[in-house]
């Protein structure tokens, strides 16, 4: 089977990762210690995409847990699913990266990275046919951002032909955890543009909004936010974990979603959104799900797709869903919102179906969109970056770890290029391609 090796780095990555494993263990009928007591053979059929079978009916996640300080790891180990993970797969330092990207990427993280790669190698050797890697991390901190991107590039070197998907938590406009977030995020995006095949952008502020607006939670905890993220991660990986009518794997997803290699930053959404503990008992219909996933309020990244256009998108439906109904709904959405889809990629919505719904729901759908409006997110970070970089604020923390200012300048211009590429394709139309931008067009008033 096509296995996936999962890495989680830094505090954010480990907490999201823990929520993800909790969600999919439940879907596959595993208890907190990895013992199978499920009811359906479908749960077992593709168990080994994410789990290794150990002796005695026990399943172990193919997960590598990385952090530069022991705190979060201890929390995961003490959590309800702490006994699930293989003890050797916890790799941690003692010093912490202190929200400093340079520490994670060049000094502290670089010392730990070989240890991590040994564990990754061992997990990869235990696979029949490794499909790729997925990594959960945040881009605003030191470990997840700095060391996470270091791991990605090292894994890229060693497994150049395997897929690399990242679930990256972007710094959000209003909710800021650290002052140097814009630096860390820009340096990370600089790496992700080159080394990742698919990056699912998640943003704390958008998650807060969903919690407050849709789920009616007054003061959402990180637990609630992670619950949302794990629902999306479980949805994106459904097709890999269960037999379905229309299956897709990481590579198929990427082939359908990435029209140009650098533009692989996706917005994600999930429906039906239900608050934790209050699983809705009302029936959900395909039209309702479709309407909900194409609703800007449901996007887990703080950018509004109505300000841009979709290059491609993918909708994954789970549960007892009729193919025809899905096709009709998707066609319906495209016809009503033609302005939001680029016309030079016909049929740019891909659908996948899986007959096993998530726990507690009759059906659900997950949305992955490659929209040019994601540039808002990069623009926002870029503006904050240049405001600080112009004054060289906080730079000594980075140069002190051996970084060069040049690297900041490169990262900044790479991110600006990314924004203008998105802009260029947003404005492109079918006829442009034929005319190939006539360079010598006379300026107004010159004729």
UniProtKB/Swiss-Prot annotation:
- Cofactor(s) this protein requires: Mg(2+)
UniProt keywords, alphabetically = Cytoplasm, Cytoskeleton, GTP-binding, Magnesium, Metal-binding, Microtubule, Nucleotide-binding
| Acidic residues bias: start-end ranges | 432-447
Q: Write down the PANTHER family for this protein, in alphabetical order.
A: TUBULIN
Family, per entry = Belongs to the tubulin family.
| InterPro entries registered for this protein in UniProt | Beta-tubulin_BS (IPR013838), Beta_tubulin (IPR002453), Tub_FtsZ_C (IPR008280), Tubulin (IPR000217), Tubulin/FtsZ-like_C (IPR037103), Tubulin/FtsZ_2-layer-sand-dom (IPR018316), Tubulin/FtsZ_GTPase_sf (IPR036525), Tubulin_C (IPR023123)
Instruction: Indicate what this protein is called per its UniProt record.
Output: Tubulin beta chain
From the UniProt entry, list the residue stretches annotated as the region Disordered.
424-447
Q: What does this protein do?
A: Tubulin is the major constituent of microtubules, a cylinder consisting of laterally associated linear protofilaments composed of alpha- and beta-tubulin heterodimers. Microtubules grow by the addition of GTP-tubulin dimers to the microtubule end, where a stabilizing cap forms. Below the cap, tubulin dimers are in GDP-bound state, owing to GTPase activity of alpha-tubulin.
Source domain of life? Eukaryota
Q: What does the entry list under GO cellular component?
A: cytoplasm; microtubule
